């Protein structure tokens, strides 16, 4: 294939992108300086560990510009090969997180830890492990301090003593990864290809089951079954080194269930902190917040530490709320439990919500799990319990496209309207939802359609300092009074 010469349009876009980067860099440096001078805990928007609005906008703009530069200057064929093999980046990170490499490095000298020492503790042959770590160093995760020594950098350090974040890496790289491997076949199959049934996905093919993912996660099985699914899924890597002991009934819980619950806390901390500060929770006083399908209560856990007047009810399947009540909250916020500020209720969100007239009904990462018909049922079950003053907050990704959406802000031209590279995780999660549960990350128009079908009306999309937004919905007759 002959090399194609660049056009005047390409040159113009390159200059425009360079100017955006130059201007944005100045904003980032100014915001970094302001952060360094500010007293600890006095962020510009009262949000520890959260960037100012100006810094957040600058971050996503410069990441979008980096993506545009990559598009403009890369050799097309080389770029195709690069993207085709990027799954190895994810696998290398999974190996490092699963073997707790960041924690091993944190316990060593600042100058780095020798690969032989890392290898001995991680139980991976040193030359192979060194190649994996060099790969990660090349994409800015970890740093190499000598020919055979490695240390954490600011990126890998995020995993040190961070079980929830580690769990998220495990979540998407265990059965989630195996499901993605089966996705091409599933899309072409005459039965599963056009289906949005939660039990007809690539994930069922991967783990060799007819159960839904939630039913499978809650199974109790013989220990040896954890490594012998009968399908394409090999199980959690560490199980190769030893299976858990049988419990009194001769069975064990799947480790993926606990990983799932903990990962929701980890993901919430990354993308959910903004929702604690970018919505006016303080104005609600002692309002009752019902977290529908709330898992172990990860988001109320965040809110409870910032707004001590708020009250919470966490609703989900029995084994999940049990994990929140008995393991997560006693460790993370026992005071809220003792004060009765949080309750855990077993509930299926397809049934009419048992809590009537709550101030806020909160749906985080629920609707993206389900296709449209299921979502309308979930929303209608909440609507029937809402009072005139009630509000529904949907915490989900609101997908923009590279050509933009009239309901969402766009990046400056010539950058992709949806901020391109900045949204890579959002689109990746959309395909993960497709692979595992036939779920969907939706556009504003798609959310409006769901709400209308359920007898609700979209009031506002809260643009938060996150890739995940808050969609506020109300009963139609109250929309004019809010």
From Swiss-Prot:
Alphabetical UniProt keywords: Methyltransferase, S-adenosyl-L-methionine, Transferase
Residues passing through the membrane, by range: none
Listed Pfam families: Dimerisation, Methyltransf_2
Name of the encoding gene: tpcA
UniProt source species: Aspergillus fumigatus (strain ATCC MYA-4609 / CBS 101355 / FGSC A1100 / Af293) (Neosartorya fumigata)
An annotated GO BP: secondary metabolite biosynthetic process
Keyword Acetylation: no
Tissue: Specifically expressed in conidia.
Protein's name in the database: O-methyltransferase tpcA
């Amino acid at each position: 294939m002959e090399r194609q010469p660049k056009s005047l349009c390409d040159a113009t876009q390159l200059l425009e992108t360079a100017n955006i980067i130059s201007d944005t860099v100045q904003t980032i440096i100014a915001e970094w300086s302001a952060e360094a001078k500010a007293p600890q805990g006095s962020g510009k928007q009262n949000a520890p560990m959260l960037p100012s609005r100006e810094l957040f906008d600058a971050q996503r703009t410069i990441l979008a510009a980096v993506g545009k530069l990559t598009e403009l200057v890369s050799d097309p064929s080389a770029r195709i090969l690069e993207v085709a093999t990027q799954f190895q980046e994810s696998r290398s990170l999974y190996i490092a997180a699963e073997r707790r490499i960041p924690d091993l490095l944190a316990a060593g000298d600042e100058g780095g830890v020798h690969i032989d020492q890392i290898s001995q503790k991680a139980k991976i042959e040193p030359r192979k492990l060194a190649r994996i770590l060099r790969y990660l160093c090349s994409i800015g995760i970890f740093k190499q301090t000598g020919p055979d020594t490695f240390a954490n950098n600011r990126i890998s350090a995020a995993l040190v003593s961070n079980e929830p974040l580690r769990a998220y890496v495990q979540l998407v790289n265990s059965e989630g990864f195996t499901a993605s491997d089966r996705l091409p076949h599933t899309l072409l199959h005459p039965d599963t290809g056009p289906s949005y049934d939660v039990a007809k996905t690539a994930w069922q093919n991967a783990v060799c089951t007819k159960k839904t993912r939630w039913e499978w996660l809650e199974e109790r099985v013989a220990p040896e079954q954890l490594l012998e699914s009968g399908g394409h899924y090999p199980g959690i890597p560490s199980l190769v080194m030893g299976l858990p002991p049988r419990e009194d009934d001769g069975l064990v819980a799947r480790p993926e269930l606990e990983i799932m619950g903990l990962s929701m806390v980890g993901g919430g901390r990354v993308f959910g902190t903004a929702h604690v500060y970018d919505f006016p929770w303080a104005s609600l006083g002692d309002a009752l917040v019902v977290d529908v399908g709330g898992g172990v209560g990860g988001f109320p856990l965040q809110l409870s530490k910032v707004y001590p007047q708020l009250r919470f009810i966490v609703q989900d399947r029995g084994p999940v709320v049990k994990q929140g009540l008995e393991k997560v909250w006693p460790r993370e916020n026992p005071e809220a439990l003792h004060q009765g500020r949080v309750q855990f209720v077993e509930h299926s969100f397809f049934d009419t919500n048992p809590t009537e007239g709550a101030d806020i009904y909160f749906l985080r990462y629920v609707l993206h799990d389900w296709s449209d018909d299921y979502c309308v049922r979930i929303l209608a079950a909440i609507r029937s319990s809402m009072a005139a003053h009630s509000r529904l907050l949907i915490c989900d990704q609101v997908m923009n496209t590279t050509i933009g959406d009239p309901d969402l802000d766009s990046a400056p031209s010539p950058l992709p309207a949806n901020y391109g590279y900045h949204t890579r995780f959002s689109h990746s999660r959309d395909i993960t939802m497709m692979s595992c549960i036939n779920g969907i990350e939706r556009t504003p128009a798609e959310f409006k359609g769901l709400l209308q079908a359920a007898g609700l009306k979209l009031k506002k999309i809260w643009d938060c300092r996150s890739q995940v937004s808050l969609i506020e919905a109300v009963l139609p007759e109250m929309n004019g009074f809010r």
